[in-house]
Curated annotation (Swiss-Prot):
Name of the molecule in the record: Glutamyl-tRNA reductase
SUPFAM superfamilies: Glutamyl tRNA-reductase catalytic, N-terminal domain, Glutamyl tRNA-reductase dimerization domain, NAD(P)-binding Rossmann-fold domains
Residues carrying the site annotation Important for activity: H99
Enzyme class, UniProt record, top EC level: oxidoreductase
InterPro entries in the record: 4pyrrol_synth_GluRdtase (IPR000343), 4pyrrol_synth_GluRdtase_dimer (IPR015896), 4pyrrol_synth_GluRdtase_N (IPR015895), GluRdtase_CS (IPR018214), GluRdtase_dimer_dom_sf (IPR036453), GluRdtase_N_sf (IPR036343), NAD(P)-bd_dom_sf (IPR036291), Shikm_DH/Glu-tRNA_Rdtase (IPR006151)
Residues forming the catalytic site: C50
UniProt catalytic activity: (S)-4-amino-5-oxopentanoate + tRNA(Glu) + NADP(+) = L-glutamyl-tRNA(Glu) + NADPH + H(+)
Gene: hemA
This enzyme's EC code(s): 1.2.1.70
Lineage: Bacteria, Bacillati, Bacillota, Bacilli, Bacillales
CDD domains reported in the protein's UniProt record: NAD_bind_Glutamyl_tRNA_reduct
Amino acid sequence: MHIVVVGLNYRTAPVEVRERFSFAEKDMPQALQELLRTKSVLEGVIIATCNRTEIYVVVDRLHMCGYFIRSFMERWFGVPREEFTRHLYMYEDEQAVRHLFRVACGLDSMVLGETQILGQVKSAFLLSQRQKGTGTWFNMLFKQAVTLGKRAHSETAIGQSAVSISYAAVELGKRIFGSFSGKRVLILGAGKMSELTAKHLSGGGADEVIVANRTYARAQELAAKFDGTPCTMQEAMERLADVDILISSTGAEGIRDHVGQVERSMKRRPDRPLFMIDIAVPRDIEPEIGVLENVFLYDIDDLEGIVENNLEMRRAEAVKIDKMIEEEMQVFANWLQTLGVKPVIRALQEKAAHIHESTLDSMFNKLPELDERQRKVIRRLTKSILNQMMHDPINRIKEMAGGKQGAEALEMFTQIFALEKHLEAGAPVGRGKRRLP
């Protein structure tokens, strides 16, 4: 059997392609059942996010797997395969396992090290499990992937630094104030960047978030999302003396030509710093404002510098996670090898039981004078001897099966004890039966 993943993501397909291959949440159970009915598929999990659609399967035939999965996608989405095949990637066995581990750890995400994908991987696995879509292989693999993803974030610092402009603005504010508790925030502009910044600030414990916009209705709409206070741009200028943090992202008016008004506001609040972040292009806030006493002004270039430094730090942490992934891949490979030992041990036990019974039958036929009690004693004694004789070989082959030469050890063990006839047809024993080097 083999592990395969077929998918597309933000690297291989633009958004107009990705949105055509997005599984609706309500349709996922049906999609999984359809996938599991696909020829050669034994287990299946579908991970579907805005940035990726990936189909993980355990199959019994590798050479036709790609064709079968593409056919499934063609049927489900109603899109001819010629229109999407060039956007697909396909990983097999070892590469498929490595890819899943990287996805779960956030190393394959658009934002390196993000944590949302880990929850999505777990949810996809649990959904498939409820739909009876996972078996021995994926139950082990996906649990291991989720555990590894948690370790990656708890044992490294990959998620502890801002890599978006909006979050970098918040991180910068924390450096100055230490905490947003008791702080008032004024946001100029109600666009996407302002919304993200307001979300981070509100989540960081700011007492009040005031939103000003040229269109008052839009200010009301954004303020309502964070239990904030809307106001007009003129009112915002009048409230400068009351706020601790100002984020400007209008790209139009901001507080240009208001140096004098800012200076007067600062005189009304002696010894209280005002933290200003200008994330607009062109800039909203005149650089001259930044030289006023107790005013800390930063623009988007300052924030991009922080983001780049943080990205470098995340890349360094990703190297550590890559090492963790390689270690976990070996753990999974060893586990796969141990699956092959079960039918071998069972075959040995069945052969030993057959020899034991036939030998006792022969002996009892030659000694008809033995009563039932004597026969039971002989049966227990000989079975105890047999079990003791098998104890060490069984424990040793269990250990060896999990090692690097596990497949070879199973083959040799099978030959030494002549177990071929006792093995179940198609039992996964020996080299080439379990594919994950």
